[in-house]
Swiss-Prot record:
PANTHER family referenced in this protein's UniProt entry, alphabetically: 80 KDA MCM3-ASSOCIATED PROTEIN (PTHR12436), GERMINAL-CENTER ASSOCIATED NUCLEAR PROTEIN (PTHR12436:SF3)
Sites of N6-acetyllysine modification: K748
Taxonomic source organism: Saccharomyces cerevisiae (strain ATCC 204508 / S288c) (Baker's yeast)
InterPro entries: PCI_dom, Sac3, SAC3/GANP/THP3, SAC3/GANP/THP3_conserved, SAC3_helical
Ranges annotated as biased composition (Polar residues): 54-76
Alphabetical list of Pfam families matching this protein: SAC3 (PF12209), SAC3_GANP (PF03399)
GO CC, one annotated term: nucleus
Protein name, UniProt field: Nuclear mRNA export protein SAC3
Molecular function via GO: molecular adaptor activity
Keywords: Acetylation, mRNA transport, Nucleus, Phosphoprotein, Transcription, Transcription regulation, Transport
């Protein structure tokens, strides 16, 4: 090919002249050229590479125009017809423009170049956009009918599958031979690619149905009946099959044609959408299979557009339905297929527009595409390249509005690009979501962003709140952020760790997260809007999916490019290929005929590859061969050698003109005949020379005649062209004159308006300056006054705060001094510190700080002495705020009225109520005092009527067991009762031991069975179960061992919000369920009172000594013995000076004592009497053996006490009733009357001994005292018998055993 110097266009992949596929000049893309203006005309889109030759499906073997070689071996080395070549012709050079206008004048010569093959990476497979006619191969049709008949006739599923499997191998080989499918194991050039078309007329291929029947992968939706084993032919849908690496390509019988795919999707919409949400996975797979079949056939026609659009709508509907339901599904997979469908639609829309067609629903799905990547700024740039009618569409503008409203500069996510137009108008977003004009499917798509929009909305609100701001009510969040209910708000707040106040408000200041995605945490479940759900209920799924305009019925889809535009270079090349092929075929018919090469320097100056033709001509390939030869000087025969230069110039003028040149049929035939005659004359024999010369002469004359006619036509055309030039010149002059006058008037008017505007602006400037200056001075004056006022107010407030701080500091200093003195006093008394162990290591004591372990210095007063936070109950703050909690109880109506009914009405019975607490100064104990209408712990309340008399008494560790004779109810406070508790379990264990000690004293003195109410103050941090509390307090042991004196045990856990109500209910329950019973001591006292009443003892003026005196004597005796015993141990113990430290330790009861201090093995095999006598140095004679230490025999004689002793002859009775005890329980038979009243009564040894002591004291008289056993050294003012001492030691051993258990 001959080209001019510097005019060859480089064949690169850089599309310098490639524009955007847009046919409209819109305001949105006015600066962007629609197509390559160099190589395209009439605003049509070029190929994907401007230098690529277009290929058509009608003819595969096409060869572009190229220069024929001078060598006769050209026919052997000619280029392959199936390949594509780069175009560097004169037309392209003329459009681009050469570097030099006429290189020949400068001595340059044209060089011939071989056509370069088009690179493979520039070859594109054009999709089919027009509707395709369905054509099925007869053999394939017969084969599918045979497969269907076999499916109906064979019932065995395995046999059917094997039969069809064998037929499939034959089918593949025949399809490969027919060229309907590519071979499985052979590589194939892209030039030889086939146009694949599916031929399956069912919604699921026959072979796949058979295979799935064997594999048991048929869904219930694909069967006629749920119990069927075979898939129904009318209901089965083809599954998606992921292509394997080495798998064979699908057969035509496995792929459904476009009209069957439309039918399949219609079936899904009409019959399966109502089965959602259970069928979500099934529909997801079947819709993906539909899109896969379109891809197999490389089909982008109307059916593909319709199916992909409806698939997008179905995915949007599924997103809403699945979020609304509780069925688990993969949101990521649904969004992935939705995005892929939108990308496929965008590519089809671009291809259709480049071909001159339109799609009626493009704007709707362009809007969905904008929402698919709602924070990607690249989509904003792409949408501006679309035509105006799409960019200005209502749906596209609405999608752009949502993109702007949702944009948020605080959004943090990997790959997110922050832009300058981030609005975060979350309130406007939720207003638009409630608008009825919002399309329903678009609303479903936007619902996917509800969680992050709500999160960043609350985060923005949290930045606007100060520390004193109240929590945001739930009703405000529900209305502003469209939460469906309060439960949804609570779940949202709990997920993002937002504190909820009183169950109806959220403290946004506690929001600490910066992103809506929490690391290592499952995402929050997607939610939906009820306003959209209500709109969905008013429509049907089918109507929602099939909405929009029908693509299949659209009259305008793809326009014919041949009718609407002038053919481009690629089309011209295609025409030249057809002509060149025809010429080569005719040239090869006679290999001996060779054209004569003209070596004359005079050549026709026509441009190669320029073939003017009529736009309306439909027979484009039929171009004159003579004209084709004249365009190429290498192929021009001698017959044109005598044309004058003027004729050449005229031909060049015609060639360069804009009007088409039309060849008539006669000229074309004559030229062809002349060419044939000339070629024959070069090879024929001499006999024909004369005949041929005459024919040539005639042809020459005809040619000259034709040229004369052409000259006439050219002359007329030249005249018309001259007229056109003159007309244009006159029109240009008129336009210039009119434009000049108009411009002058416009400029004058603009100048006057500009001057007026300038004067107006100057006047306004002066006035505004004065106004602003006055306003500024006024603001400065007001600021000065405000500053003065503020300073005075601050000084006043500062002084007040200073005075208050001084007073408080003074009080704290006084209190600190007082506490220091108390600690110092206690340290001197106990010898150990009274606070917790320090968490830091103190320095080694030196001479200056000997007492540093017992006193707090000023430098150590801020140290924390415990690694564990102190326990505090839940009501420490709650009790101080609600006044009704402190209101005293109405004990008469709540408790005493019901209790009176339980006591006998024939006498007045005392029934006292004791409240126990270690420290009555704590808040919880003060609350108890307030509820029982007591001011201090020393106060008491009385109640009496004709039946009972009661007193409410408060006790602590310092109590007298003898006061419990008339106890009816014991209230025991435990748990977090003090603010300085650091180990709750240890506290409960100590309280349990104290409770056992207290109940032991009560059991020895009470006359009636009492109720035990334990008030447990729950810890706010360490919550214990009820079973744990009972175990720590040893309630099970208490209920077992003291069942004879305890009527019932109740545990009240104050964990509710209304403790006063809980206390009222518990007291009322105890009063209703109480059963009046006498204890063994009560029964015994009652019997004695009856006996004494019969004997007249009650009439004496001098009453007998009560058991209280004995108790006091026994107590003093125990203290004396204990001190004496401790003194003796201290004399022998080297470590005695450390016992005070051991006793003061809070864990002394829980750890093992050293062997040196342990006394557990000192008297392991001694009786209590022997142990006592060994420690006493004043004893001279062994005491009598204890009658309680003897084991009770089975046939022991029971001393009868039925006969009452006369009062006049009191005597000391040595016949003490026999007592038996087993473990901790004892059984006493006092008399035959007691045996009849209660046959088997189990009581503790302490109770028995107490009654015996009481018996002995009552039966004695002052005249006849008991002879002491001890010697005179132990006889003082308090004469205590040895039997009593022995009994007390035995009681102590039993108590110790009970406590150890």
């Amino acid at each position: 090919m001959n080209t001019s110097f510097g005019s060859v266009v480089p064949s690169t992949n850089f599309n310098f002249f490639k524009g955007h596929g847009n046919n409209d000049n819109t305001s949105a893309n006015s600066t962007v050229n629609n197509s390559n203006f160099f190589l395209n005309s009439n605003e049509t889109k070029p190929s994907k590479n401007v230098f690529m030759v277009h290929s058509t499906s009608q003819k595969k073997s096409q060869q572009p125009l190229q220069n024929l070689s001078h060598s006769p071996s050209y026919t052997e080395n000619k280029p392959d017809k199936k390949k594509k070549y780069m175009i560097n012709d004169a037309k392209t050079i003329q459009l681009v423009g050469p570097l030099i206008s006429s290189p020949d004048n400068l001595g340059f010569q044209k060089r011939s170049h071989k056509a370069r093959e088009l690179p493979r990476f520039l070859i594109n497979q054009e999709p089919q956009l027009e509707k395709r006619a369905f054509v099925q191969d007869p053999w394939d049709k017969a084969n599918q009918e045979k497969m269907i008949s076999l499916e109906e006739s064979i019932d065995d599923l395995n046999e059917l599958y094997e039969t069809l499997k064998k037929m499939r191998n034959t089918e593949r080989s025949i399809m490969e031979e027919k060229g309907l499918v590519d071979k499985a194991d052979s590589a194939k050039d892209l030039y030889d690619a086939i146009v694949f078309q599916g031929t399956c007329l069912d919604m699921c291929p026959t072979f796949e149905r058979s295979r799935r029947n064997v594999e048991y992968t048929v869904y219930s939706y694909e069967k006629n009946q749920p119990n069927d084993k075979k898939a129904s032919r009318t209901k089965a849908l083809k599954v998606f099959a992921r292509p394997a690496a080495a798998a064979a390509p699908p057969l035509p019988s496995d792929v459904r044609p476009p009209h069957i795919l439309v039918k399949t999707l219609d079936y899904i919409v009409d019959n399966l959408l109502t089965t959602l949400p259970e069928s979500e996975g099934f529909l997801w797979d079947r819709m993906r299979s539909i899109r896969q079949d379109f891809t197999y056939q490389n089909y982008s026609g109307p059916e593909a557009v319709d199916c992909n659009e409806r698939i997008v709508r179905i995915h949007l509907l599924i997103l809403h339905i699945m979020v609304k339901s509780n069925v688990e599904f993969s949101l990521q997979q649904e969004l992935e297929q939705l995005h892929k469908s939108l990308i496929t639609l965008s590519e089809i829309y671009d291809d259709v527009r480049s071909s001159g067609g339109t799609c009626p629903n493009e704007a709707e799905f362009r809007a969905y595409a904008l929402l698919s990547k709602i924070r990607d700024p690249q989509y904003d740039e792409n949408i501006q390249r679309l035509p105006k009618h799409i960019f200005q569409d209502k749906l596209v503008q609405m999608a752009l509005c949502f993109r702007r409203v949702i944009s948020n500069s605080a959004y943090t996510e990997r790959g997110f690009v922050k832009t300058e137009n981030c609005l975060n108008f979350y309130a406007r977003f939720f207003q638009l979501m409630q608008s009825p004009s919002l399309p329903l499917l678009m609303g479903f798509f936007l619902q996917m962003h509800l969680t992050d929009i709500r999160f960043y909305a609350l985060r923005a609100l949290s930045h606007t709140l100060n520390k004193k701001h109240k929590p945001i009510p739930f009703i405000y969040l529900e209305n502003m952020l469209l939460f469906n209910n309060r439960q949804e708000i609570i779940e949202f707040c709990n997920y993002y760790s937002i504190e909820i106040i009183n169950g109806d408000a959220a403290d946004l200041k506690t929001l600490q997260h910066y992103s809506h995605k929490l690391s290592e945490t499952q995402p929050l479940k997607k939610t939906y809007l009820t306003c959209l759900e209500r709109r969905l209920q008013k429509t049907t799924y089918k109507g929602l999916i099939n909405g929009g305009e029908d693509n299949l019925a659209s009259s305008v889809y793809v326009k014919d490019p041949k009718k609407d535009r002038i053919p481009s270079i690629a089309d011209q090349s295609f025409l030249m290929e057809n002509f060149q092929n025809n010429y080569n075929e005719k040239l090869n018919q006679n290999s001996s005929v060779k054209p004569q090469i003209n070596t004359s320097p005079k050549r026709v100056a026509t441009r190669p590859n320029h073939f003017p033709f009529s736009q309306e001509s439909k027979q484009l390939p039929q171009i004159s061969q003579s004209h084709t030869l004249s365009t190429n000087p290498l192929l021009t025969p001698q017959v044109h050698g005598d044309l004058s230069e003027q004729k050449q110039q005229q031909i060049k003028t015609v060639t360069d003109g804009g009007s088409p040149f039309v060849f008539d049929q006669s000229a074309q035939n004559s030229t062809v005949e002349a060419s044939k005659a000339h070629m024959i004359s070069t090879t024929s024999n001499g006999a024909y020379d004369e005949k041929l010369s005459s024919e040539q002469e005639e042809m020459r004359k005809k040619e000259e005649q034709r040229i004369e006619e052409e000259k006439t036509q050219l002359k007329k055309k030249q005249e018309n062209a001259d007229k056109q030039v003159i007309t244009e010149q006159i029109a240009n002059d008129l336009v210039k004159e009119v434009v000049n006058s108009s411009v002058i008037s416009i400029v004058k008017r603009e100048f006057s308006e500009a001057n007026y505007r300038k004067d107006f602006i100057d006047t306004m400037t002066r006035e505004l300056y004065d106004a602003f200056l006055h306003e500024r001075l006024y603001l400065i004056y007001m600021d000065s006054r405000a500053e003065l006022k503020r300073n005075s107010t601050l000084k006043k407030k500062f002084f007040e705060k200073w005075q208050a701080s001084y007073s408080q500091a003074k009080k704290n200093r006084i209190l600190e001094e007082k506490k220091r003195e108390e600690i110092k006093l206690v340290s001197h008394q106990l010898g150990v510190p009274g606070f917790k162990k320090s968490t830091c290591l103190f320095r080694t004591p030196y001479k200056g700080n000997v007492n540093s372990s017992f006193m707090l210095s000023s430098s150590d007063k801020n140290l924390i002495f415990s690694p564990v936070n102190d326990e505090f109950n839940k009501f420490a703050t709650h009790l101080t705020k609600i006044s009704k909690l402190w209101r005293p109880l109405e004990m008469q109506s709540i408790y005493y009225d019901n209790l009176t009914k339980k006591f006998p009405s024939n006498s007045l019975t005392p029934a006292n109520l004791f409240i126990y607490a270690k420290d009555w100064t704590s808040l919880s104990n003060r609350w108890i005092l307030s509820k029982f209408n007591l001011q201090t712990a020393q106060d008491s309340k009385k109640f009496s009527n004709n039946i009972i008399s009661s007193r409410i008494i408060c006790i602590d560790d310092e109590y007298e067991p003898s006061d419990f004779s008339d106890l009816q109810l014991l209230i025991f406070n435990t748990g977090v009762t003090n603010p300085d508790i650091f180990d709750l379990e240890m506290k409960l264990k100590d309280d349990g031991e104290e409770l056992i000690k207290l109940i032991t004293g009560i059991s020895l003195n009470t006359n009636i069975c009492f109720s035990l109410l334990i008030i447990y103050w729950e810890s706010a941090e360490n919550t214990l179960s009820e079973s744990t509390i009972k175990h720590l307090l040893k309630l099970n042991r208490i209920s077992k061992n003291y069942s004879s004196v305890i009527e019932r045990i109740d545990l009240m856990n104050l964990t509710e919000e209304s403790p006063h109500k809980c206390l009222e209910d518990k007291l009322s329950e105890i009063s209703h369920s109480y059963v009046y019973k006498l204890t063994e001591r009560g029964k015994y006292d009652k019997t004695l009172r009856q006996k004494r009443s019969l004997a007249g003892i009650h009439s004496r003026s001098t009453q007998l000594q009560t058991t209280k005196d004995i108790d006091q004597k026994m107590k003093k005796m125990l203290e004396k013995e204990k001190n004496k015993y401790q003194q003796q141990i201290g004399e022998r113990n080297t470590y005695a000076h450390l016992e005070s430290h051991i006793d003061a330790s809070p864990r002394s009861k829980k750890r093992k004592l050293p062997i040196l201090l342990s006394t557990s093995h000192s008297s392991q095999f001694k009786t209590p009497l022997a142990s006592r006598l060994n420690t006493s140095g004043s004893s001279t004679s062994p005491p009598l053996p204890s009658h309680l230490a003897m084991k009770f025999r089975k046939n022991s004689r029971v001393t009868s006490l039925h006969t009452v002793l006369p009062v006049s002859t009191p005597s000391h009775s040595n016949n003490i009733p026999a007592a038996s005890f087993s473990g901790n329980n004892t059984t006493d038979i006092q008399s035959q009357q007691l045996i009849e009243n209660q046959k088997s009564t189990s009581v503790y040894l302490n109770n028995v001994s107490e009654r015996i002591l009481g018996n002995q004291e009552i039966c004695q008289t002052p005249i006849n005292p008991v002879t002491p056993v001890l010697d005179g050294a132990d006889q003082g003012k308090e004469d205590i018998p040895d039997s009593i001492l022995e009994l007390k030691i035995l009681i102590d051993s039993v108590k110790k055993k009970v406590n150890n258990d």
